[in-house]
Amino acid sequence: MTTLDLTARSDRGRVYWLLADCWNIVRRGLTHYQRQPVNIAWQLGFPILSVLLYGYVFGSAMKVPGGGDYKDFLMPGMFVMTMAFGFINTATLVVYDSTKGVIDRFRSMPMASSAVVAGRGVTDLITACAELAIMMLTAFAMGWRPDGGLGFLGAFGLLLWLRFALIWIGVWLGLLVPNPEAAGGLFAVAFPLTMISSIMVAPQLMPDWLGWVAMWNPISSTAAATRELFGTPVGGDTWVEQHALLMAGVWPVILTLVFLPLAVRRFKKLSR
């Protein structure tokens, strides 16, 4: 009979084992994708379908304030929408692990609770990079031509920054909902929240009250900031529109400060 040597973990620093535990969770998540290629194919295929569908269906039917090509306006919004919808996949994977007993096994191991949560987040961030790369290549093939250089890299970083913040909402919700079917129902909540934003239509073209809500939607700030960095700024008259770059950095910080502790606390509560 073998026993688990817990003293070995005390020989090294807490940070080391936190990172080691986090990496084990990341490796487990990536291996899961490798063994179930259908899941990753769908996760990477949906962004392509979104770009093609919205790009060709709405590409010549919508107007942009101040003129300009709607495709240049739409593509950054589509990138933001995919990052926003990603939290549903996070929640679904977390609740799937919970119902299959995987979370119980993690709780029985001598590993940090925060490492389990963080490992899920890092895994999803890696897949988000792949999603963005595929979407941008598809958009480029459709004729989208952003400005290159630091602006392009900055926009890519802001998109991942938003995804990073929304991951913790997905983890928290995944630990709350009872089954994967209920997690799938989160789409009914996410869809209107993403539509009431500037990802497809400028808030100036909405009714006044709805436009005000859309302007203060965190998704709108990231959409406006990425458009500016990609070289197709839209602008606006309100403070939040004129400071889109600032708010695109601030909103994810607020969301992370709120939902990351909630996710870790919920995981610890399950351990009691």
Swiss-Prot record:
Q: Where is the ABC transmembrane type-2 domain?
A: 38-270
The coding gene here is drrB2
Q: How does it sit in the membrane?
A: Multi-pass membrane protein
- Keyword annotations of the record: Antibiotic resistance, Cell membrane, Membrane, Transmembrane, Transmembrane helix
In Swiss-Prot or TrEMBL terms, this protein is called Daunorubicin resistance ABC transporter permease protein DrrB2
Organism, scientific name: Streptomyces coeruleorubidus
Identify a single GO molecular function assigned to this protein: ABC-type transporter activity
GO CC aspect terms: ATP-binding cassette (ABC) transporter complex
Q: Which family does it belong to?
A: Belongs to the ABC-2 integral membrane protein family.
Q: Does the keyword field hold Ribosomal protein?
A: no
The protein's location, in the record's own words, is:
Cell membrane
Higher taxonomy: Bacteria, Bacillati, Actinomycetota, Actinomycetes, Kitasatosporales
